Amino acid sequence: MLKSNYTPDLVQRVILFLLLFVSVSCETLDPYYKTQENLDLSIQAFNFEFESKAMNISARFVHPAHRANYKAQSLEMTQRITFFEATILDIKFFKIGVPVVTTSKGPEKGFNRAIVTIRYQLAILPSTKLVTRLVEQEWVLEGEQWMVIPDLSTLLE
């Protein structure tokens, strides 16, 4: 009789690995996790472009109803503000206007709005003094794309 080179312990480990792999793979295909990931990526990309003063590029993340106003204020932003540091302090999630429960796994499913609180260290010309501003960015889910509704006035005060 032929004897297998694989020990029962090794076979159990391989099966356990495959089960874990399939479990994790299924989670990444879940639209809920995709929504969360898309929000995170949109926040990072917009703020990187915004802080780099690439206003025309960052405008792709601005809600269409607010894009014209954003572009109108962009010249003043690029001329007067120098960013030194930005830190995301908090993200609150909402589903149809109602706050959702957030656990260690993240917010509950179905959220379609988020409020991101960011602390900026910046200088606003003509002053060269470093100031701190707390800004709330409102993000809304439009179809499958997250869009920001920016309020630049808090930065220009």
Predicted features, each with a name:
Residues 24, 56, 146:
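Glycine-centered loop/turn positions within well-structured domains
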Residues 45-53, 61-65, 80, 142-145:
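Structured segments of extracytoplasmic/periplasmic soluble domains
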Residues 13-23:
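Bacterial N-terminal signal peptides
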